[in-house]
Amino acid sequence: MGDSQGPGDSGEPRDSQELPGADAGGGSPAAAVFDALGAEYERAFAASAAHRESLERLLADLAPGSRVLDVGSGTGRPTARTLADAGHRVLGVDVSPVMTALAARQVPEAEFRCADVRDLPLPEGAFDAVCVYFSLLQMEREEQRELLERLARSLRPGGLLVAATVPVDAAGVDAVFMGQPVRVSSFGAEEFAALFARAGVTVEWEHSALFIPDHPAGAPEPQLFLHGRRS
């Protein structure tokens, strides 16, 4: 279920002014869940072939040195790590202080901010790509709709929106995820794809998978990956 200034090549901080505002993470239910899970989450999902395929497709579509926003960046791996290794400029945002600290250590080439993306300004056209891997599921449905529209506007024309979710029809359902209590909202596959269209993003690739997290409390979950382009 569901990424401070990083050093540039010269050793100086990269110029990353896309998201002004002070860091403000922690305190939310999602932060509590992922603070508790920490590196366990990365280990549980490390074998996801579908996530890797999604990242490979994204890399193939990005121009060199692209600016990428990673929403719900977690430990920084695999998303920020893969993008940074390819020379892209990555800004990760995550509500979990534990996850953000792990990411900063594991991917020092990227910048990570501990904050709730819903509270951050998202300047129009600031990014070449935005990744949202499984980071919407603890938001209410209307919050997901609104955030995807804001994220789409933060893309330059022709920019790429990449998202993954668990495609089930659920609104405020109490569940247990890797031993942690969560409240989940999501959309079925067709409804989720419709959110892209509503946001002005044309879906170019869609992939469904079934994944079992490598964790004692892991259970099979359907996964949906969408890649789209802003009109």
Located regions from the model:
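Class I SAM-dependent methyltransferase SAM/SAH-binding core
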Residues: L69, T75-D119
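A short acidic, Gly/Pro-enriched loop at the edge of an enzyme's catalytic core
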Residues: R118, L122-V130
